[in-house]
């Protein structure tokens, strides 16, 4: 199980969620804590760099958010991130600096490290994607196996 430890999987300096990730050994231990972490961190973000755009939604002033994107909090969208047309952020989402959440991509209870790309027709649920990860079109990650049993 050594290879599954957070310290062996991720470059922690590439996420605003570093403190949360350092509090656990395995990635799945972090998932139930994302919501509270966002709310706590969001209230501490530099107001010169981030705007609060709704209840528990903080968006970096340099981020680009399409007018057709839907963002439900809690959520933090990092500097220079791009939230494209019809992206659906269901809540409990940390989107890293320079990340791309694309057309018709849905996020729920996730941490996307800096420069992650989920550019089109993706579903990312209950997941952590590391620095510079890229998901191809139509890819799905979630906590349900194809046989519908919990992972």
Write out the residue ranges for each language-model feature.
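Periodic glycine anchor positions in long extracellular repeat architectures
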Residues: 60-63, 78
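LRR N-terminal entry segment and analogous cap-like coil->beta motifs
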Residues: 64-68
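Terminal amphipathic alpha-helical/low-complexity segments used for targeting or macromolecular assembly
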Residues: 1-56, 61
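Flexible, glycine/small-residue-enriched loop-and-beta-strand segment within the central core
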Residues: 42, 71-77, 82-151
């Amino acid at each position: 199980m050594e290879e599954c430890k957070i310290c062996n999987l991720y470059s922690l300096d590439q996420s605003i969620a570093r403190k949360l990730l350092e509090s656990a050994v395995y990635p799945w231990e972090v998932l139930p804590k994302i919501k509270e972490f966002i709310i706590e961190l969001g209230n501490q973000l530099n107001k010169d760099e981030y705007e609060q755009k709704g209840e528990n939604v903080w968006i970096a002033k340099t981020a680009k958010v399409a007018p057709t994107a839907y963002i439900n909090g809690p959520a933090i969208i990092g500097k220079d991130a791009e939230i494209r047309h019809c992206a659906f952020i269901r809540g409990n989402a940390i989107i890293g600096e320079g990340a791309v959440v694309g057309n018709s991509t849905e996020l729920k209870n996730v941490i996307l490290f800096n420069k992650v790309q989920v550019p089109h027709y993706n579903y990312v649920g209950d997941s952590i994607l590391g620095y510079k990860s890229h998901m191809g079109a139509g890819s799905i990650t979630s906590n349900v196996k194809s046989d519908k049993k919990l992972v």
